[in-house]
């Protein structure tokens, strides 16, 4: 019997969309998509996250005015219920995905654990 692991992975992806975690994430995502203010703020927040990550990778320090701007955006994000709901749903979805990854990679992890004995 030939097993096509990609068929199984695609089936898992379809099943994922039926989970409580994915549905909650999709609902939160849609709420932001349908709110121009939340969508704009979330986009700005993502741009800042990317800028911070790039600065960290290149070992640069942000300028004080950048930090002030970033703090102001972060404060707005904390007050936006839709963005907070998305972040909470995303965290739950990521937990599920991590658990699934642990299951899928269990044979590899077990093999490596035998090297330590």
Swiss-Prot record:
Q: Which Pfam families match?
A: Com_YlbF (PF06133)
**Gene3D superfamilies, alphabetically?**
YheA/YmcA-like (1.20.1500.10)
What domain of life? Bacteria
Q: Which family does it belong to?
A: Belongs to the UPF0342 family.
- List the protein's name: UPF0342 protein LEUM_1212
Which organism is the protein's source? Leuconostoc mesenteroides subsp. mesenteroides (strain ATCC 8293 / DSM 20343 / BCRC 11652 / CCM 1803 / JCM 6124 / NCDO 523 / NBRC 100496 / NCIMB 8023 / NCTC 12954 / NRRL B-1118 / 37Y)
């Amino acid at each position: 019997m030939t097993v096509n692991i990609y068929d199984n992975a695609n089936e898992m992806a379809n099943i994922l969309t039926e989970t409580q975690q994915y549905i909650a994430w999709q609902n939160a995502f849609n709420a932001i998509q349908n709110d121009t203010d939340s969508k704009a703020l979330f986009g700005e927040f993502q741009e800042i996250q990317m800028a911070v990550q790039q600065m960290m990778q290149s070992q640069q320090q942000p300028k004080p005015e950048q930090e002030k701007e970033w703090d102001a955006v972060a404060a707005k994000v904390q007050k936006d219920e839709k963005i907070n709901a998305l972040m909470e749903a995303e965290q739950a979805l990521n937990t599920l995905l991590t658990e699934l990854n642990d299951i899928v990679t269990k044979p590899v992890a077990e093999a490596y654990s035998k090297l330590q004995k």
